[in-house]
Amino acid sequence: MNILYIEPYYSGSHKYWINSYKEFSKHNIHILGLPGRKWKWRMHGGAVTLANEFNKLDKKFDLIICSDMLNLPVFKSLCNNIDDTKCVMYFHENQFSYPWSPNDPDIKLNRDLNYGYINYTSSLISDYNFFNSNYHKESYLNELKKYLNKMPDFQNKDSVDVIKNKSSVLHIGCSLTKSNSIQNQFVEPVILWNHRWEYDKNPDLLFQTLFDLDEMGIDYNLIVLGEQHQDYPKIFDEAKNKLEHKILHFGYCHSRDDYVNLLNQANIIPVTSNQDFFGISIIEAVSSFCFPILPYRLSYPELFDYNNNKINFYKTDIEFKNKLIDVINNIGSYKKTSNTISSNIINQYDWSTMAKKYDSTFLKII
């Protein structure tokens, strides 16, 4: 089967996802993308540019998969010879549920809902919609209902059910390599941060807790990874100074091999995020035997099977602190649990498994 993937924001996790699927898939996948910058302009203008590029292609596709950053109605209206080709949306994020920076001028000017509307019309016109977690799917549908309820008339509320009836969950596949160093990993506690340096990841809770633990004389080491932009939370600078004596690495890692090696040095990943539709960075860390400490919210109870792994979850900030202290002080006793969780995660989300699921799912669409 020949698949075309349309990506206005071909960068970061979006690029990682489709490139990995292309590598493991039995289908032929062609990628049509634009550089990942100026996301608002990509959601508005990307469809026009990509439609022009599509019309230059001398190839017939069986299926078109579109990123949530694409304005699908505009794209389809400008494309030649596309009417009989099925188009599906894959939602990494959506602009109804995704938290905006309070400093964004579009919020003050009441322009922020325009991007959610693009998601709405795209999911309405698509032949099918996939979401990277059930939490994401339900969050999107609930926020869409709220959005339509705010409209003055002709709210088209029945369109929510139309979208719901052609939507399902297709978890993200990950390139997971099982560490061979578990015996050494659980000698000394090494805490890992490998998420984006963004406010929605709630770094303040983690680092303020680590400051407290340092003052209490609790011994641990720290590895801080993750992509950062110019306007990152300043708690990272404070952490770099206050915890300098505990830091093994601090900053973005450009090499994939170096990144994996650093994951393999860590054994605890405390998660404090207020927003996460999936959690690739956490899946990667857990596959390297890091013991996850997870909030009981977002996609985590779904991905990490809360009913069978309650030991990994917390519900309050105090519970988070106490659980982190316990894991640090008793790191050796958590080795067996981490091994079990890691094996389950690899078996479930590695591309060797997920690519087969993707391939069969997309075949059923056409």
Pin down the residues of each PLM region.
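Conserved donor-binding/catalytic core segment of Leloir-type glycosyltransferases
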Residues: 130, 171-175, 182-201, 206-212, ...
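Nucleotide-activated donor-binding/catalytic signature segment of Leloir-type glycosyltransferases, i.e.
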Residues: 161, 226, 234-254
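Donor nucleotide-sugar binding/catalytic pocket of nucleotide-sugar-dependent glycosyltransferases
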Residues: 124-180
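Short alpha-helical donor nucleotide-sugar binding micro-motif in glycosyltransferases
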Residues: 260-266
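A charged, aromatic-enriched C-terminal amphipathic alpha-helix characteristic of glycosyltransferases
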Residues: 41-45, 315, 319, 332-365
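Aromatic "clamp/platform" in nucleotide-sugar-dependent glycosyltransferases that forms part
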Residues: 274
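Short hydrophobic beta-strand element within catalytic cores of glycosyltransferases
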Residues: 291-294
